[in-house]
């Protein structure tokens, strides 16, 4: 895929079950790639309010949605749920978010992006979002219901 208008410090994610890759553009919009045959970039329509800034995404298979964090620090976790017809010309994808009330607030991410330091995980029966803002940062875990 040539020059997809993706900032260098963001992370795309693949929804394997849907055969779709999604990423956030430099302007904060959503772009997707239909991976079912010859890859084709398209702009899905969205509902709700997105973060409006750079975002690293991860696919949450159990929740059937993309999960992400903006690079602004803070606790807000963003969700981008593809529609039942997520491909070009299909139904709108839905933005939503949550901001946990407790716990420590992660710092801003490293200026070069998260580079894979954002993961949806299940461990010892606990499901959530594991986030490491920088290579020498303390890890943060957002529990299930958040991720």
Tell where the protein language model's regions lie, with residue ranges.
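Short glycine/acidic-enriched loop and turn motifs that connect beta-strands
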Residues: 28-29, 71-76, 125, 135-138
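Entry beta-strands of beta-propeller and related beta-repeat scaffolds
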Residues: 17-22, 62-68, 123-132
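Loop/turn-rich, solvent-exposed surfaces of beta-rich toroidal or solenoidal domains
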Residues: 49-88
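Blade-level signature of beta-propeller repeat domains, shared across WD40, Kelch, NHL, RCC1
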Residues: 109-147
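Repeated scaffold domains used in trafficking and secretory/extracellular systems
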Residues: 3-14, 49-59, 105-120
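Short loop/turn segments immediately following beta-strands, especially the blade-tip
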Residues: 33-40, 79-93, 143-147
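Surface-exposed loop and turn segments in beta-propeller and other repeat-based domains
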Residues: 1-4, 45-49, 90-109
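Beta-propeller domains
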Residues: 1-42, 51-53, 73
